Amino acid sequence: MSAEQKKYPRVLIVSHTVLARNTSMGKTMDTYFSGWDRDAIAQLYIQSEIPTDPLCVNYFRFTDPDALKSIVQRRRKGTVFTEADVRTERADPVEMGNLTGVYNYGRKRTPLIFLARDGMWRLSGWKHSGMLEWAKSFRPDVIFYASGDYAFSYRITRFLSEKLGIPYVICCFDDFYLFNPNRDMFLGKFRHNRFMKTARETLDGAAKILTVNDTMAEVYGRIFGRKCGVVWTAGNMTEMPEIPEKQGIVYLGDLGLGRNMQLSAIADAMRESEGPGIPEYLDVYSAETNPDILEPVKSNPGIRFHGAIPGNQVREVIHRAKAVIHTESFDPVIRERVRYSLSTKISDCLASGTGMLAYGPAEAASMDYLIRNEAAFTATSPEELREVLPRLFTDEAEYRRIVENAKALARKNHRPETTRETVRGALAEAAAGKRE
């Protein structure tokens, strides 16, 4: 192995979705692997998508429809994409055709769907799909597995590792292990126990385990008996010019997981709070289209809903605002769901120079992170929210202190070069035979 290859080993990425810069996962992977030669990265993925960004130039796709058809056609092959097949003119990588309805039904995360999908992959001919031959032709030094909540992708990762004789590194972006959303449903506990058996075997065999925040690393370290590394989400550190009069309060992003109700509660608290400077409206920017999720937002007289905006305008909207919101739900089930997750948008908000208002349960990893580092105006109850809002808009000394704390935290944990080096170091050490 050359000195360059020791530093930047050839990496086979295994994940469910294709690499695309217009998705959170794609942006994250773009940061992780920006130092690599594109020829030294290949991706194996599952979803019915086509490459739209040349983040690498070697892809192998084997989808659910392929798996289903291969039960009968045992030698059904997967699809190989090269640089010539990358469709940069397309904004959306999804390629569904007439299977959209079937696929969307299959995405419903019920115990029966989980078990049926995993059973289909067990019966399928994915081992004879050309996957191994394609991987051998790429000659990877190490596998980077972006873990998910379906057992079959863990088995694929172990299979390739064993057949190629190379180690794998697992990166846990979300909590699929402690939280079982289906525990009260028929077969929910049975399905989760089966999944955890496969996940534990795969985690035990990993050269390294990476997580996306220190809370997750600590908890997983105790549960799985392994040292877990932390690779923080990178933020945009580019300095923006000072704005003399920042105005307004904004929220940008997903409205699911109860965030719609939280935003409505914040707008109500703004209207009820006494004090100068509190804006009349909360401005919400989101690509959400589900009418049931949108209803609490659109019906609140204190919220102006703007829909989606282009990604290149997000920083400008945050920068011009006096405050940007991060929120998590108090709903008991959702609280457990997000307990160990850290929003990918927090890193950009920390670096923005705009004060953050964080509203949610104290035990959520994102809330705990901001509270511990005094990097936001935080409220963990409706009463505390009504108390903190006037201070956010009137106490300039506290505002400046919190903004500076946030920027310092961004520089410490969320610099793109730090994130890249953490991932590069983990993969290089794994390829060299080091295990933690």
Language-model-detected regions and their locations in the chain:
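A short, active-site helix/loop in glycosyltransferases that binds the activated sugar's phosphate group
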Residues: Q47, E201-C228, M367, V423
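Conserved N-terminal ligand/cofactor-binding loop architecture of enzyme catalytic domains
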Residues: A42-S124
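Conserved acidic donor-binding segment of nucleotide-sugar-dependent glycosyltransferases
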Residues: S343, P361, R372-E383, R391-A397
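Carbohydrate-associated surface elements
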Residues: T215, T233-A234
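A charged, aromatic-enriched C-terminal amphipathic alpha-helix characteristic of glycosyltransferases
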Residues: T380-E383, E396-L427
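Membrane-proximal helix-turn-helix segments that form the acceptor-binding/catalytic region
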Residues: G130-E133, R155, F159-K163, F176, ...
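Conserved catalytic-core segment of nucleotide-activated headgroup transferases in glycan assembly
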Residues: N236-T238, E242-V297, R304-N312
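Nucleotide-sugar-dependent
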Residues: G258-M261, N312-V314, V324-L350, M356-D368
